[in-house]
Regions:
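Amphipathic, Lys/Arg-enriched alpha-helical "gate/interface" segment within cytosolic domains
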Residues: 2-131
Length: 131
């Protein structure tokens, strides 16, 4: 089931209660859209009472400074921790700095959300849907 959104694809599988998010590009000129996108993801998680998210960050480009990127990702993690989300899986990029930001954000919500990153889509899905 596709959840309507102007800026990104939110594909929800109610059978497994998994929301698939194709992560957007982040450039200085797209920051207002990125803020909107984060709000939309949080709203979808709340509205559909989603328990699992899979984000695909492999193709997204980030040109904002890492400090700004970290602030955004930390904000997302902290907002997700206020929902009933249980598991968050991420498909890895090849950017070590971005992966470090993701790991740091995950550390902010330890105990609230279980986080894992993967290189393989099938492994990520299997991890999300296991009990």
């Amino acid at each position: 089931m596709i959840i309507p959104n102007k800026f990104l694809k939110l594909d929800y599988n109610p059978t497994y209660d998994v929301l698939f998010v194709e992560w957007p590009n982040m450039h200085d000129y797209t920051m207002p859209e990125v803020t909107y996108i984060i709000d939309e993801v949080i709203e979808a998680v709340r509205s559909y009472d989603i328990k699992r998210i899979l984000t695909d960050t492999r193709q997204s480009k980030v040109t904002v400074p890492m400090e700004e990127y970290a602030k955004i990702i930390n904000q997302l993690a902290l907002q997700l921790a206020t929902t009933r989300l249980q598991k968050f899986a991420k498909l890895n990029t090849r950017d070590a700095d971005r992966e470090a930001v993701s790991s740091n954000a995950a550390a902010l919500v330890v105990g609230s959300i279980t986080y894992s990153s993967f290189d393989d889509l099938d492994e990520a899905v299997a991890w999300l849907i296991e009990s």
